[in-house]
């Protein structure tokens, strides 16, 4: 009897199994398409309203420009209608007449950091390439108006946008992605929160192209689940989780002494953390595999994203909603204010005479910035008693966000006292931009102590100002920024305090520092806003091309 029942169940499973394998993906797609259809129906009214508002604002804007004179109108037209079509990987050129809606998922758009510079530079490049396109930013900054945000963009980044085609939709669920909301299982919690926030965004408007510029891979995967005909693009500043993070948990690994979680993979709690991170990394890989166009800010980030997302992206039909991707993961360096620094900071034989033996470290006082390592290295450098060390000074410039940062500054001051170098180290907290520029003019060396800095905008700023860099031998500063130019060095790399001390000695003892400064400034030209715009357009054109192919198809 038992054997017969077992045989019956086995035969049933053997027969039904293949059907289930076909049926489950079908149901999965059906659920996603149904939810997507519901969201489209729900937001059609707002879509029409946005198009009407853009048209009305465009008329008002043209009228105001006409009132100011033909010259102002011509300058504005030249500013936003001068980017040529560059074509896509399929050999076709998609002209400027594309007039769809590009949704930028950036819940903290008014923060004013490097990530926000990328967002606004991307929107400006998009406006110049497709003047008829509408750029919609999903943000959680309820306390500021469109006018206030755009004014801050001009003041903070000197980026001038075309106001009529920029709109903001305000999210009410941003708290779900705050680390403070998830004191435990923070990575998983914030990723789950991004799904809630993405639903909030799509409940406001379904865009024609969906772009994430903050690193919410789960939101992009959710978009693909709901709208299979909406191309997605990701600009990845850093992977949410990386292989280096996983390896750093093991004290015996090559990176077991680096990072804020170094060596924490031991014991029952440590092993549980490692399993949790490994499971999360697999989910993260699945989400990233669904993205049509992936851009990273550096070679380091590209390598880690390829390692995590690449294997699944190359599969065909292995996961519902994921198909083979022909678009390679591209490096698009973030825009840095190189031109502004070139104008503000002189690099010449005359200015060389005004440089001081100052080691300048510009960074927020966060634990990963590793200020302690730099202070210890500077103390070792002074102990050498070399000619370069006699009048050297270390200047730490950075912002203090909260009480935790204040405590770190206090501990650094204690360390400086313990090392008896108080009179050789200066702290400048929350310095203004003019003050920072003045230090960039005076200093000789720029320092960066962070392990695996994903890119390193501050290091590019050092180079643009003509400083000789001594940076951590990892991440973007090593692979992309402080590299040779014309076969000659632009700076030095280090890992330990001893190596940093040696790097300080080399940087301050160069026989011809002016030549190195010129090479450093030449190196920085690779990271201009113009170069970013060119690469950004090249990648976003792929999304427009996908949309052009999908357009004849009926909406799902």
UniProtKB/Swiss-Prot annotation:
It catalyses: an alpha-D-Man-(1->3)-[alpha-D-Man-(1->6)]-beta-D-Man-(1->4)-beta-D-GlcNAc-(1->4)-alpha-D-GlcNAc-diphospho-di-trans,poly-cis-dolichol + 2 GDP-alpha-D-mannose = an alpha-D-Man-(1->2)-alpha-D-Man-(1->2)-alpha-D-Man-(1->3)-[alpha-D-Man-(1->6)]-beta-D-Man-(1->4)-beta-D-GlcNAc-(1->4)-alpha-D-GlcNAc-diphospho-di-trans,poly-cis-dolichol + 2 GDP + 2 H(+). Residues 29-184, 206-454, 476-556 are cytoplasmic. Its main location: endoplasmic reticulum. It is a single-pass membrane protein. GO terms for cellular component: endoplasmic reticulum membrane. Residues 185-205, 455-475 dip into the membrane without crossing it. It is found in: Endoplasmic reticulum membrane. One of its GO terms (biological process) is dolichol-linked oligosaccharide biosynthetic process. Residues 1-7 are lumenal. Its EC number is 2.4.1.131. It holds the Pfam family Glycos_transf_1. Residues 64-86 are annotated as: Disordered. Keywords: Endoplasmic reticulum, Glycosyltransferase, Membrane, Transferase, Transmembrane, Transmembrane helix. Pathway: Protein modification; protein glycosylation. Belongs to the glycosyltransferase group 1 family. Glycosyltransferase 4 subfamily. GDP-Man:Man(3)GlcNAc(2)-PP-Dol alpha-1,2-mannosyltransferase that operates in the biosynthetic pathway of dolichol-linked oligosaccharides, the glycan precursors employed in protein asparagine (N)-glycosylation. The assembly of dolichol-linked oligosaccharides begins on the cytosolic side of the endoplasmic reticulum membrane and finishes in its lumen. The sequential addition of sugars to dolichol pyrophosphate produces dolichol-linked oligosaccharides containing fourteen sugars, including two GlcNAcs, nine mannoses and three glucoses. This is GDP-Man:Man(3)GlcNAc(2)-PP-Dol alpha-1,2-mannosyltransferase. It comes from Neurospora crassa (strain ATCC 24698 / 74-OR23-1A / CBS 708.71 / DSM 1257 / FGSC 987). The lineage of its organism: Eukaryota, Fungi, Dikarya, Ascomycota, Pezizomycotina.
């Amino acid at each position: 009897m038992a054997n017969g029942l077992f045989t019956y169940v086995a035969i049933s499973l053997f027969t039904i199994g293949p059907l289930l394998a076909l049926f489950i993906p079908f149901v999965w797609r059906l659920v996603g398409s149904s939810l997507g259809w519901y969201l489209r129906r729900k937001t059609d009214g707002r879509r029409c309203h946005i198009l009407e508002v853009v048209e009305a604002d465009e008329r008002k804007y043209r009228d105001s420009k006409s009132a100011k004179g033909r010259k102002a109108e011509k300058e504005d037209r030249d500013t936003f209608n001068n980017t040529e079509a560059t074509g896509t990987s399929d050999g076709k050129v998609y002209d400027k007449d594309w007039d769809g809606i590009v949704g930028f998922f950036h819940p903290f758009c008014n923060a004013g950091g490097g990530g926000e510079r990328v967002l606004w530079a991307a929107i400006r490049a998009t406006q110049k390439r497709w003047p008829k396109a509408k750029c919609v930013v999903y943000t959680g900054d309820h306390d500021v108006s469109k006018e206030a945000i755009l004014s801050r963009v001009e003041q903070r980044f000197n980026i001038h946008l075309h106001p009529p085609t920029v709109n903001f939709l305000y999210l009410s669920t941003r708290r779900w992605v705050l680390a403070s909301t998830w004191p435990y299982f923070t990575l998983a919690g914030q990723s789950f929160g991004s799904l809630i926030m993405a639903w909030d965004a799509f409940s406001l408007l379904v865009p024609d192209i969906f772009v994430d510029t903050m690193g919410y891979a789960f939101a992009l995967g959710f978009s693909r689940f709901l709208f299979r005909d909406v191309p997605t693009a990701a600009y990845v500043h850093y992977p949410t989780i990386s292989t280096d993070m996983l390896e750093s948990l093991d004290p015996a690994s090559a990176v077991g002494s680096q990072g804020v979680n170094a060596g924490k993979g031991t014991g029952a709690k440590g092993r549980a953390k490692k399993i949790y991170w490994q499971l999360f990394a697999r989910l993260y890989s699945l989400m990233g595999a669904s993205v049509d166009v992936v851009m990273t800010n550096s070679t380091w980030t590209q390598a880690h994203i390829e390692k995590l997302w690449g294997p699944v992206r190359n599969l065909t039909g292995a996961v519902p909603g994921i198909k083979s991707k022909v678009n390679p993961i591209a490096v698009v360096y973030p825009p840095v204010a190189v031109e502004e620094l070139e104008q503000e900071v002189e690099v010449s034989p005359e200015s060389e005479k005004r440089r001081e033996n100052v080691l300048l470290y510009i960074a927020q006082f966060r634990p990963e910035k590793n200020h302690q390592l730099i202070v210890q290295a500077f103390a070792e450098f002074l102990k050498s008693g070399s000619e370069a060390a006699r009048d050297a000074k270390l200047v730490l410039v950075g912002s203090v966000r909260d009480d935790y940062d204040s405590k770190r500054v206090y501990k650094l001051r204690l360390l400086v006292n313990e090392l008896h170098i108080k009179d050789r180290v200066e702290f400048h907290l929350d310095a203004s931009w003019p003050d920072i520029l003045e230090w960039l003019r005076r200093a000789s060396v720029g320092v960066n102590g962070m392990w695996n800095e994903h890119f390193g905008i501050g290091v590019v700023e050092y180079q643009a100002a003509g400083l000789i860099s001594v940076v951590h031998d990892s991440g973007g500063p090593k692979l992309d920024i402080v590299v040779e130019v014309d076969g000659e060095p632009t700076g030095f790399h280090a890992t330990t305090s001893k190596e940093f001390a040696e790097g300080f000695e080399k940087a301050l003892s160069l026989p011809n520092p002016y030549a190195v400064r010129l090479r450093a400034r030449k190196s920085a030209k690779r990271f201009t806003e113009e170069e970013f715009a060119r690469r950004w357009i090249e990648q976003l054109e792929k999304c427009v091309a996908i949309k052009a192919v999908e357009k004849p198809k009926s909406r799902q």
